[in-house]
């Protein structure tokens, strides 16, 4: 048995002879950390398109931003931030695929929310400081646990427990009063069988966008028992956040004013607006915040049954609770179950109010894999089952000038619903060496989902005269086969190809925000990948062709719901196709360049958009307007994404200069439809302009225990946006004609900004 491994990055400065003897005695017992969770990862002869990011690479960019921004140099990745800083509410897309179609696991355990399918990185502040490495698979990838990988998957492995006692402090401070403080400590190996490790973090920022402040706290702790054949590890991590709303974006008429004399306001935030005071100054609700806490528990077992057979198993449990609070103007009191003041003078039909909407949820389950490896064959039998229980409810805590029901008391509940979901999957995957050069790969997965939503939603149903009634209970059975070949011509050249099928069930918003008489369908993806790899001493190159054919793809339609979540609709026939090129070269000793380029086309065939029509009184007509556009571009899917990274190292000094280019993106699927906004007479395309952003990072190590870092983001002060939304409708005119109306908002990112960092190791 081979016990060699890397066990951590921060070793206590004992004398070298003591450390060597201690390590030799302990390595036999702790080597198992390196063979955990291999069943859900791709390896060097798996015909899957993937990128590995190791601990050093993560640490080089981890000064406080969320994980989506740490992945920016990965091929085909776009990141966005509501606050414009990369901290707080952030998200990403891979190959144009939005985040709730990207499977994310931690140590093989599902992280995606069972109902929304998203991962809310704001609930996991500074999690990158507790990562050993991560793998990004593009396309369907290998079978994994949790929500289906429908364009990409990310597998994160938490930090190995170091051999020796240690302590670390890592602190950052910079623009927008952004700060990060991280404390880490570990016991080292105790009595040859035990070890413990912990982290505490605090992150704060005022945000680039007005009032878009964040206050984030988190911890990570783990303890393990191990011997030569067994590792039992308990991990817990938690995040608590308080974030001021910035999810509405900046309206286009403020960001792009039609009057040249009016200066654009890139930091404007409409959230929490309460009206103007007597002097005409806008007033904003101070507690327009999102408040949530989420805690994860993992208990994992790795048992070496014999030299060729290993068992991985884990139990997991996640507890989440929180709410967002917001000030809403001119709300119809009927929609909150409040007596609207009939018979009262003066009559009160609408009023400003403050509401809180809660999410109280539980998620738990187990995963396992039995991994066999011998000679030419690697085989994994694995799977898992989990159960989710989530309560959604809302309270009205204050009503302005309310003259209605005198029995009203603060925190009056106006809706409640429950979501329950079970998810079971089992997979069998194998990689077999037919010859010295040729490997064949097969992967079969069966997945069953049982989902139920019942109760009242937070949306008023005017036809029914009450809150939207929810009684939804779909059941899905999916079969996801995958297969491919990997051919190694020689040590420098390799070729691979694969075909994979994936299915994905609609999420909660797909059901609750669907149009009238519209029932969302499950999606099907057939993914074709063909890749070439070249590696030699001083340079490397790879090219990957992909064609992703969708049936009933749920594509972003440019609209958002009341809390800024992007909405989707099914399209029968669509595809994504492109080429991903990566290259790296050691130019001279100490100077390296790495880059990647994605060129793609992302199309919907025979696209028809259905648009709401309102009468002169603002009431929705029963039949929507159908606008046919033919073949169009899929929203938020640029044709070009390019990254470049120059790294210069001289003794203890390192400089990194990276560039990121993203081509034009459309806000919806109409392929660049132009609009006339009632507050902006210019016609403006429903799109996000291309942008080119450059960052410079400098670091210097004062020996092994002290380092300083400086990050200058957006070095050339590019004025750009990474996300946006559009809402459109028609108004029926007196003569029967239709008058279009559109609202658009964008999410600007910060101009040039700076973060300084110091790291101390003890």
Residue positions per predicted region:
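Membrane-embedded beta-barrel scaffold of Gram-negative outer-membrane proteins
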Residues: 310-316, 486-488, 494-500, 521-577, ...
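Short acidic/polar hinge/loop motifs at secondary-structure boundaries
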Residues: 110-138, 157, 254
